[in-house]
Amino acid sequence: MKRFLIALGAILIFILFAAWIGFYSFVRGDSFRDWLSKKVSRSVRADGRFEPLTWEGSSFRSAGFSATGNPKNKLRSLKITNISAHIDWHQLLKGQLVIDNVNVEKIEADFGKGIAQGTPEAAPQPPGFKFSNLLPSQLRVDHFYVADANVHWRTNRGDSGQFTDTKISATQRQADQWDIEAIGGKVQHASYPVIEIERTEGTIDREAITIHDAKATLSGGTAIRVTGNIAIAKQLNAILNVDFTDLNSNVVFPATWRFGGKLSGHLIYKGNLDRFEHGEVTGSVKMADTTVDLANVFGTLHQLAKFGGLNDVRLDSITTDIRYQDRNTRFSNFRAGYQDQIRVEGSGSIGPDHVDADLVVGLSPKILGWIPGAEEKVFTDQKDGLHWTEVRISGTPEQPKEDLTKRLVSAFRDKMTKEFKGQAKDAIKTLLDMLHR
């Protein structure tokens, strides 16, 4: 009996030793590389393969991993360069295969419309024992770091963009869910200004990207902060909250509008990022230290301001609520003012081929004193020390029209006719010349 137990123990030791040798050979051979390639490919929903693995203890290195997308995935291609990883073999005793740390030198990822390709039939596999059958069905990666990540994309409309030169650190919290931190990098999409990324924190899983906090800047000192959610399973439906400060007005308004100042505000974007320009933007905007050439819309008001000693019109601030969609902007609760001399309030809309606004304009007696009859016939309401009137704006952004001049001339004509009678014609001509200098 004693000899039998010794023999049985020797056999068990031999089996375990042989199994270890076999498993050791399997891990360091192409079979494990194939198994690992399939697991990673399934995770990124692509077809990929590792370059040969070289081992040092429980760590391995590979020159890279390359993958191509499929028709059901927006990932078109993925190339990972110079990979090093460490496997925690002790987790096998718990039924898990865990890579606890991965370091990557560079990633190049290309997203867009899925690649049309046929699905090859799997080659029949002969039955038999495989060491891969002993491995857990799931592979877990606890943490990875990318020294240089670059993501490129193209929308369904053909607009391209990229997020380049960023460092990414990611930690897996649960199956297919990662906490992501990106530091540095540049984002550019279509013809929009380049955004410099300071730091981004978020979560990504199979269904969505959640941005917990993203901080960025534009040239000129503009600060941007973003939070929100982007669906990635099918359509790129997004809800993004954007706060910004010190945005130069020439980034937003055409040069012909002659606006100057710094914008700040809070905006909410809702829409499909594949059709970004069709999304809806709502929120509020404020412009401080504003300079504006009133002649672009209010030619009359511009001249009155000059005659009133306000040659360079600088508004203390402009505030408004906006709603933008399909290249059309609606504004409400619009308020603009200059000291105690000028106030403009109202609402309206602006599009590529139209301007439509209903405003009320308040002017000081100092300005109105230059136009006889203006207070009595046009600026008839008094409030907050100003005289007010309604103004209708129409036309196009290139050629806006207002109905103020006609009413001022009519009031002036009536005033002159009543006071000077026969000399009214010359007085009216003088006024028209004055208003159109």
Regions found by a protein language model. Give the residues of each.
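Outer-envelope beta-barrel architecture signal
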Residues: V98-D100, D142, D176, L236-A238, ...
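Secondary-structure transition motifs
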Residues: A63-A175, T290-V313, K406-R407
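Elongated, acidic membrane-bridging lipid-handling scaffolds
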Residues: P124-A223, G228, D326
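N-terminal type II signal-anchor transmembrane helix
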Residues: M1-R45, D426
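Amphipathic hydrophobic-ligand
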Residues: S41-A46, K72-I87, I99, Q125, ...
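N-terminal leader/targeting pre-sequences
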Residues: R45-P71
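Extended terminal
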Residues: M1-G9, N272-E277, G309-R437
